[in-house]
Curated annotation (Swiss-Prot):
GO terms for molecular function: monoatomic cation:bicarbonate symporter activity; zinc ion transmembrane transporter activity. Pfam families: Zip. Residues 347-355, 445-657, 708-724 are cytoplasmic. This is Zinc transporter ZIP6. Residues 95-186, 202-246 are annotated as: Disordered. Residues 29-325, 377-423, 679-686, 746-755 are extracellular. Belongs to the ZIP transporter (TC 2.A.5) family. Zinc-influx transporter which plays a role in zinc homeostasis and in the induction of epithelial-to-mesenchymal transition (EMT). When associated with SLC39A10, the heterodimer formed by SLC39A10 and SLC39A6 mediates cellular zinc uptake to trigger cells to undergo epithelial- to-mesenchymal transition (EMT). The SLC39A10-SLC39A6 heterodimer also controls NCAM1 phosphorylation and its integration into focal adhesion complexes during EMT. Zinc influx inactivates GSK3B, enabling unphosphorylated SNAI1 in the nucleus to down-regulate adherence genes such as CDH1, causing loss of cell adherence. It is a multi-pass membrane protein.
Length: 755
């Protein structure tokens, strides 16, 4: 970096020394430039280049000069400020290879930001620039290095092609060996001599003499080029003219330059501001126009933003706060309303269609919850690049200009964000792969067991006859015990049914199974004769038939059957594990008030955590809140269905169940408000909320819902397990796809909203 700066300064002031009289003549006769400019090389606006260069020179002279001239002391201050007054020893432990790819950045501000990254907290950033000022070791060496600096963008001009090939390796090796070859005193004295010469010619411009670095005949060799070079002498030759003093009073040359920093130009902006085409190769003469602008930007630090300035210039979050409140309120309202509408599905709970629907909804919830955790919540909790991008972008644009924000900020942020997105998608791929493996292995095992069972044939006619007799005996036994069972249930277990609403009549077969589980625990031996036919009358008849003849294993068979019945009861009546597992008798004894309190507290705490996640997500941005809201909605629907089933079995009416669920949903609004306040007013707390929410989502998805998907009771209803398998895969992949689309187009959603 110091090598470039040395070349820029030497070339600028050396060229200004070689032809001062011609510049005075050009200033006295401005019509000369107008006549020659049409003959200038196509693609370059000479007038604009001259005026822009004049502006930057006046900025430098106003900053360091007095009476329209630059003294030795002022020039020394300029060199010290940009960090090339002498060689300084610093210890920075980082890889220097990044200096060899300047063309990758293609703009001054990114390289300048990287060079000054370690000095943002103090004002001694000259040391860092001096790390690269080893190019100032000799005068002859400086002459060839100015076009070499621009070899990245030109590469076609013969004057520039000399140093193009060796630019990067020599630049890197020169930094390593400079301490052995050049002493600090030599470079300091050389720069001081250059300062003395340049300043002397500026002050005594009436009697110019050529500098040591350039020949005398430069001014007479190419008149068109020389006429177009309005360098420092144009400013110095007008000491008595008001053309210099008037701009100093204007808004461009006010003393408030530091308060209103200049725009940070990249390579394209520098060329266009000087009237040069982006595709036009630069030679040394044309590059001379750019030198004052480059030096002015380095000196004014237009491309640096200090930490204190960032915090001071960040605009208030009024816009994002409004979006957070509106979006969070709408999201919570939609989720609560649609979840309450799930009560219309309660009458369908005993139908096969409901099993398919619930299986798909659970799989969709798994996909959205895990997708939101891996693709959105965890990436945002690990890195705050999106958070800083959304809030710091106005300040960055004020400081650096819209072109820089579009070219650098967008590309870097998108590449970093997509990297975390693909890693999260890889984690989801591992999760889905293990789900497929476990599910497919289970299906294969069940298929083999079914095949072995079908292959078992009766060996002789005696076995067939025995089975027929056992079947007759079973039917007679069930008929005889039916009366006793009716009397017992009338006196005991069904006494509470007379007090229930009529809408529970359709659920009595399911309740009988619950009661039989309780009976089996209390009296395993006494009620065995009535327990078997009643429980196995419809669903477990074949299992009982296969083992009933084995009189030696009756007790063992009883325990096996009890396990199967209890497992079937759990799967049949609690398709989603959010709902509490209570028998009907327990629900009745508990009372409506106690159960309502349990639902409000248990389900309300869950809704509060969901609202907290939604509120914090909307403070991050609209797309963040959208993805979290979709994930919450997809797992709230089956969750609310389970809660409705529990409340209705407790004896509540539909209106009461809706009311208590609505009360628990109110806690979601409280959680949303808490999340918005924390995310907006607390520093970086929303990142911790995202991490906590990701853990909650993954627990609900992987611990609660995935086991329900793996252990479904499709075969008990005569349904194909493969049909369930494909339906569950469709739900999971749909959830993954929704979260992936939101994650990929998240930055575009924010961009459109901002405009």
């Amino acid at each position: 970096m110091a090598r470039k700066l040395s070349v820029i300064l030497i070339l600028t002031f050396a060229l200004s020394v070689t032809n001062p009289l011609h510049e005075l003549k050009a200033a006295a006769f401005p019509q000369t430039t107008e006549k020659i400019s049409p003959n200038w090389e196509s693609g370059i606006n000479v007038d604009l280049a001259i005026s822009t260069r004049q502006y930057h020179l006046q900025q430098l002279f106003y900053r360091y000069g007095e009476n329209n001239s630059l003294s030795v002391e002022g020039f020394r201050k300029l060199l010290q400020n940009i960090g090339i007054d002498k060689i300084k020893r610093i210890h920075i432990h980082h890889d220097h290879d990044h200096h060899s790819d300047h063309e990758h950045h293609s703009d001054h501000e990114r390289h300048s930001d990287h060079e000054h990254h370690s000095e943002h907290e103090h004002h001694s950033d000259h040391d860092h620039h001096s790390h690269h000022n080893h190019a100032a070791s000799g005068k002859n060496k400086r002459k060839a290095l100015c076009p070499d600096h621009d070899s990245d963008s030109s590469g076609k001009d013969p004057r520039n092609s000399q140093g193009k090939g060796a630019h990067r390796p020599e630049h890197a090796s020169g930094r390593r060996n400079v301490k052995d070859s050049v002493s600090a005193s030599e470079v300091t004295s050389t720069v001081y001599n250059t300062v003395s010469e340049g300043t002397h010619f500026l002050e005594t411009i009436e009697t110019p003499r050529p500098g040591k670095l350039f020949p005398k005949d430069v001014s007479s060799s190419t008149p068109p080029s020389v006429t177009s070079k309005s360098r420092v002498s144009r400013l110095a030759g007008r000491k008595t003219n008001e053309s210099v003093s008037e701009p100093r009073k204007g808004f461009m040359y006010s003393r408030n330059t530091n308060e209103n920093p200049q725009e940070c130009f990249n390579a394209s902006k520098l060329l266009t501001s000087h009237g040069m085409g982006i595709q036009v190769p630069l030679n040394a003469t044309e590059f001379n126009y750019l030198c004052p602008a480059i030096i002015n930007q380095i000196d004014a630090r237009s491309c640096l933003i200090h930490t204190s300035e960032k915090k001071a210039e960040i605009p208030p979050k009024t816009y994002s706060l409004q979006i957070a409140w509106v979006g969070g309120f709408i999201a919570i309202s939609i989720i609560s309303f649609l979840s309450l509408l799930g009560v219309i599905l309660v009458p369908l709970m005993n139908r096969v269609f409901f099993k398919f629907l619930l299986s798909f909804l659970v799989a969709l919830a798994v996909g959205t919850l895990s997708g939101d955790a891996f693709l959105h919540l965890l990436p945002h909790s690990h890195a705050s690049h999106h958070h800083s991008h959304s809030h710091e972008e106005p300040a960055m644009e004020m400081k650096r200009g819209p072109l820089f924000s579009h070219l650098s900020s967008q590309n870097i942020e998108e590449s970093a964000y997509f990297d975390s997105t693909w890693k999260g998608l890889t984690a989801l791929g591992g999760l889905y792969f293990m789900f497929l493996v476990e599910h497919v292995l289970t299906l294969i095992k069940q298929f083999k067991d079914k095949k072995k069972k079908n292959q078992k044939k009766p060996e002789n006619d005696d076995d067939v006859e025995i089975k027929k007799q056992l079947s007759k005996y079973e039917s007679q036994l069930s008929t005889n015990e039916e009366k006793v069972d009716t009397d017992d249930r009338t006196e005991g277990y069904l006494r509470a049914d007379s007090q229930e609403p009529s809408h529970f009549d359709s659920q009595q077969p399911a309740v009988l199974e619950e009661e039989e589980v309780m009976i089996a625990h209390a009296h395993p031996q006494e009620v065995y004769n009535e327990y078997v036919p009643r429980g196995c009358k419809n669903k477990c008849h074949s299992h009982f038939h296969d083992t009933l003849g084995q009189s030696d294993d009756l007790i063992h068979h009883h325990h096996d059957y009890h396990h199967i019945l209890h497992h079937h009861h759990h799967q049949n009546h609690h398709p989603h594990s959010h709902s509490q597992r209570y028998s009907r008798e327990e629900l009745k004894d508990a009372g409506v008030a106690t159960l309502a309190w349990m639902v409000i507290m248990g389900d309300g705490l869950h809704n509060f955590s969901d609202g907290l996640a939604i509120g914090a997500a909307f403070t991050e941005g609209l797309s963040s809140g959208l993805s979290t809201s979709v994930a919450v909605f997809c797992h709230e629907l089956p969750h609310e269905l389970g809660d409705f089933a529990v409340l209705l079995k407790a004896g509540m009416t539909v209106k009461q169940a809706v009311l208590y669920n609505a009360l628990s949903a109110m806690l979601a609004y409280l959680g949303m408000a808490t999340g918005i306040f924390i995310g907006h007013y607390a520093e970086n707390v929303s990142m911790w909320i995202f991490a906590l929410t990701a853990g909650l989502f993954m627990y609900v998805a992987l611990v609660d819902m995935v086991p329900e998907m793996l252990h479904n009771d499709a075969s008990d209803h005569g349904c194909s397990r493969w049909g369930y398998f494909f339906l569950q895969n469709a739900g999971m992949l749909l959830g993954f796809g929704i979260m992936l689309l939101i994650s990929i187009f998240e930055h575009k959603i924010v961009f459109r909203i901002n405009f």
